[in-house]
Amino acid sequence: MAKFHAPVIQDNPSGWGPCAVPEKFKDMPYQPFSKGDRLGKVADWTGATYQDKRYTNKYSSQFGGGSQYAYFHEEDEASFQLVDTAKTQKTAYQRNRMRFAQRNLRRDKDRRTLTQFNMQTLPKSAKQKERDRMRLQKKFQKQFGVRQKWDQKSQAQLKPRDSSVEVRSDWEVKEEMDFPRLMKMRYMDVADPLDIECCGALEHYDKAFDRITTRNEKPLKSIKRIFHTVTTTDDPVIRKLAKTQGNVFATDAILATLMCCTRSVNSWDIIVQRVGNKLFFDKRDNSDFDLLTVSETANEPPQDEGSSLNSPRNLAMEATYINHNFSQQCLRMGGERYKFPNPNPFVEEDTEKSEVASVAYRYRRWKLGEDIDLIVRCEHDGVMTGANGEVSFINVKTLNEWDSRYCNGVDWRQKLDSQRGAVLATELKNNSYKLARWTCCAILAGSEYLKLGYVSRYHVKDSSRHVVLGTQQFKPNEFASQINLSMENAWGILRCVIDICRKLEEGKYLILKDPNKQVIRVYSLPDGTFSSDEDEEEDDEDEEDEEEDEDN
C-alpha cells in the first residue's frame, strides 16, 4: 500500500536559505550574480575586493562585477580578442582613501586645537583672549587660503595695458609681425662699422664708486644738467650726412628698441618716414619713448593707478631721474674732459659747458648686404683711463630698487654684497627688455664697458631720496651672452623690418607694439599726422582768431 514519506524540512529562523551547505556544493567558489546579468564566462574570480572589510557592501553592489572582460558571441567575429585578467578599476573611495584619511586627521587635529583654545585653565584679560583668538584665526585663514589657491590656482588677473598711441580709424595696417616669427630671424652678414664723425666731450669715471658697498652707501645727488634726446630727423649731423651717403638713418635707442622687441611687454611706437629711397626711423614728439620702464617683464608687474607712488608711469619717471643723476655723479665733474674732434652738435653757443651732461656722439655706418647703408648715432656716457694710459669708453646705466616685497624681489641691502648674482638674476627676470636694450646700445656704440649702478630708495615710501649701494662692470659682448641676447637674431629682426619698410610707398608710417599681444604692426599714416608744423599752424590760427575777436 502506498505510503507518504514526509520530507526533511530545514528550519532557518534567522534567514531565508538553508541552514547548512550540501556536501556537493561545499568549497565551491561563488560570485554574487543577478538573474538579469548576461553570462559571458564560465567562471570569474577577479572581482575587486575592499581592503577595509567594513565597507565591503556599503558603497557598491557586486552583482555584475565580473563582466568587464566577458565574451558575448555575436555575428561579428572580428571583435573577438584575447584579454588578460587585469585588475578592475578602483572605486572613488579606494583612489582617495589616503586623502580622506589625512583630511579627517587634520580636521580632528584642528578640532582638538580649538577645544584646547576654548578651555580656560587660567584667567586671562579680555585683551589677551582677543589677541590669542585673532592670532589663531589668522593662522587658520592663512592655511585655508594656501589650500584654496593650490586647489583653484587662482591668480590675480592682469589689467589690460594701454597703447602708447591711440590707433585711429583712418590708419591702415600694412604689415603684421608676430614675435615667434621674429625670434627665428638670423642675419650674420654684418660688416664691421665705420666711424664717420665723432662729437662731444666726456668726463672721466670716478673709480671711488667701485668701492661702494651696502655698509658705506652713498646718497644720490640731484644734478641739474641738460640731456639732449634729439630724434633722427632733427639731428643736424644726420641731415648733412643724408645728402651724400646712407639710405637708412636712426639712433641707437630706436634701433635697440627694434632689435630687442621680442622681449618687450608694454606698448611702444616708432615713426618711419620714407623719402625717395631713404628711410628715417624717428620717435614721436612728447612721447614716453625715453622713459625707462620698471619691472616690465615681471610675472606680476606694478599695476597701481593714478598718482600712486608705485604706478607704472611714476616708477618710470623715478627710474629715468635716477639714471640721469647717477650717470653724472659717478664721473669726475668739473675736471678735464676727453674731447672728440667735433663739438656737441646740440649745444647752443651761450650755454656753459658745465651745464651740459657728459655725453659723446659717434656716428657709425654699417653695410647690411649690398643694398642697405645704415647710419646710426650712438652714445658714450664716460671714459676710463687704464693703468697704461689706454682710454676705454663706457656706458653708465642704473638699476633701481623700489620695493623688494613686490615682483619676487630681493632685499638689496641684505643680498647685494654676498649674493650679487641672485640680485642680477632677479633684475634680469623683471627687466629683461631694459637690460637687453642697454646692452645692445653699448655694442652698437663700441663701448668697452657697461657700468651698472645699484640705487635704492632711502625709504620704501619715499621716491624722492635715494642711495647708491654698489656698482658692477661688464663687457657688453660677454654680458649679452649672459643674458641670452643674440646679436645675430637682433640684426635679423632689424633687417626684416627694414626690408618691409623699403617695400612701402613714399610717406609716413608707424610701427606699433600691440599692448596686449606679442605682435608689432606697421600702419600707414595720413598726411600731417604727428606733424609739429601742423600743430604750430593750428596754434597760430587760434591766436589770430582770438586777436580778431578782441578787435571786434
Swiss-Prot record:
Gene Ontology MF, one: mRNA cap binding
Region called RNA gate, residue ranges: 288-302
Protein name, entry field: Eukaryotic translation initiation factor 3 subunit D
Subcellular localization: Cytoplasm
GO biological process per UniProt: cap-dependent translational initiation; formation of cytoplasmic translation initiation complex; translational initiation
Quaternary structure, from the entry: Component of the eukaryotic translation initiation factor 3 (eIF-3) complex, which is composed of 13 subunits: eif3a, eif3b, eif3c, eif3d, eif3e, eif3f, eif3g, eif3h, eif3i, eif3j, eif3k, eif3l and eif3m.
Function, in words: mRNA cap-binding component of the eukaryotic translation initiation factor 3 (eIF-3) complex, which is involved in protein synthesis of a specialized repertoire of mRNAs and, together with other initiation factors, stimulates binding of mRNA and methionyl-tRNAi to the 40S ribosome. The eIF-3 complex specifically targets and initiates translation of a subset of mRNAs involved in cell proliferation. In the eIF-3 complex, eif3d specifically recognizes and binds the 7-methylguanosine cap of a subset of mRNAs.
Entry keyword set: Cytoplasm, Initiation factor, Protein biosynthesis, RNA-binding
Domain notes: The RNA gate region regulates mRNA cap recognition to prevent promiscuous mRNA-binding before assembly of eif3d into the full eukaryotic translation initiation factor 3 (eIF-3) complex.
Family: Belongs to the eIF-3 subunit D family.
One GO CC term on file: eukaryotic 48S preinitiation complex
Entries under Pfam families matching the protein: eIF-3_zeta
Disulfide topology: none
InterPro entries found in the cross-reference section: eIF3d
Residue ranges, annotated region (Disordered): 525-552
Biased composition (Acidic residues): 532-552
